[in-house]
Amino acid sequence: MPKRTLEDTELNSGDNDIKISSKKSRKEKKDKKEKKSKDVEEPTTESTPIEVEVESKEARRERKRLKKEKKAQEAEKETEEEEKSGVEAIEPASDANAAADAKAAKKAEKARLKALKKEGKEEKADSTKSIETAAPASVTPQQNGTTYTEDPNLSGLPQSEIDSFLTTHFITITDPLSTSATLRPLTKFDYLPITDPAQRAPFKDFKAPTPIQAAAWPFLLAGRDVIGVAETGSGKTMAFAVPCVRYMSSLPKNQINKGPRAVVVSPTRELAMQSYEQIVKLAKASGLECVCVYGGVPKDEQIRALKTADIVVATPGRLNDLINQGCADLSKARYVVLDEADRMLDKGFEEEIRKIINTTPSLGKRQTLMFTATWPESVRELAATFMTSPVKIAIGDNPTGDLRANSRIVQKVEVVEPRDKEYRLMQLLKQYQSGSQKDDRILVFCLYKKEATRVESFIRQKGFRVAGIHGDLSQEQRTRSLEAFKSGNTPVLVATDVAARGLDIPAVKLVINCTFPLTVEDYVHRIGRTGRAGKDGLAITLFTEHDKAQSGALINVLKAANQPVPDELLKFGTTVKKKAHDAYGAFFKNVDTTKKATKITFD
């Protein structure tokens, strides 16, 4: 047998003896250990193993807490020493030193919070509570960084006088960031924080601000997002123009004339030009450049003007085209206005509006304003998407913003045969364009462009001074007609619905609906051309059997405004036809998409 095998055999033969001895030694060690632990446990018979374990955990937790507190104290002490040495070395007014101090303080505070983060459930709950309490401050709109200080004379007015002003003008202010008293309305032009006489010049012919101006100015001057719900002709243009120019004037001079810093979007060319004319009056006094961008004219001149323009007033279609071509940069436009927002959505510009706003600074870094005559669900969704805690200001006895005609307008509806409309139209023109009334402005609405052209020619043949404005005319012709009507050279204007919304035509005495519009909303917007700026107005509508589908909705508008309803109109019925969707027809249900859907489970 080889030697290696023999050695292995000898080792194997001794395995039993080694195993027995090792077992015996382990048993002896175990007995000694149990005896020792028994001796230790005997003096503390009251404590249980669970209690000992809890006490040891609490001791470890306490040690960790003390250790972290010590680290936090050391960090704070180190920060204080750095601040002290910084004060001795450099003057306190140094911006660099202030930045270093702020950074060090932030670092120390972070270390302290980290040290106290895991002390226990109670401390953790308190920390969470403090964070939740501080959250609203972090979402407070910063927008332009503008500040507003209330005039001392305004602050000194008794609250009863402010309440009386709000009640008299039916002003409803809803501020999601404040449950207490809101900013006081500027009841006088003297309360405006504007010292430049040139900027005050446009108000010299007015006694006091309109309700929408008085209520909106404080919030806009403070940099808040604002939703203004007010009837047409309430002075909304100046409501957003004054804060816009004041914000632009506060910018450093090296940022002026370097590209758009503010943008105003309007639904039609005429309304855009009208807003532009009002803003220019204020902008020129501050050395600001303003440009109006709309379709129907060459782009080259508009593109050149955009390079140095500070304020852009535009229609959504043309502005979106220029953005897509890379000719309009709105990345620095921190003041965004959507004028007549409901009208733009009605005209199908929602996609263009969203694209335009997405090219401006992000939410919270811009100030967004939305002015509208009504407050439908589509406008609410747009506001919820692009605005930060907006203040809603509603003017009038219709705070919900439902469709309602101006109560100062006398509405008369005449049911006539279709073939008799032109004859009756001529009778009305002779009645209201004679004697001392021969220069009174009369606005005649038609439904179609060809109809407007025919009616315009018919009125001109009868010897009346008349002009037309509709889609078939060039922009130059439309502008010339509108200016002639405003100046009074042609007191009669024949128009389609393109001029039915937002146009500020002063002193329109009478609106005649030669043909009823397709919707009752357009009817309200048409008659809204008269009775503006607190004045009374008259609207006469020629209603035929072809329009009977709108009779129910028209009757509701008349009743809501306490206007008489002729018996001939009631014969057509009071049923309100359901509005059909443009794409889905009558099978479309308009639902509130902001509400959470209800889950339905089927067995």
From Swiss-Prot:
SUPFAM superfamilies: P-loop containing nucleoside triphosphate hydrolases. GO terms for cellular component: nucleolus; preribosome, large subunit precursor. Residues 139-156 have a biased composition (Polar residues). InterPro entries: DEAD/DEAH_box_helicase_dom, Helicase_ATP-bd, Helicase_C-like, P-loop_NTPase, RNA-helicase_DEAD-box_CS. Residues 103-129 have a biased composition (Basic and acidic residues). Residues 217-393 form the Helicase ATP-binding domain. The Q motif is unique to and characteristic of the DEAD box family of RNA helicases and controls ATP binding and hydrolysis. Belongs to the DEAD box helicase family. DDX5/DBP2 subfamily. This is ATP-dependent RNA helicase dbp3. The gene is dbp3.
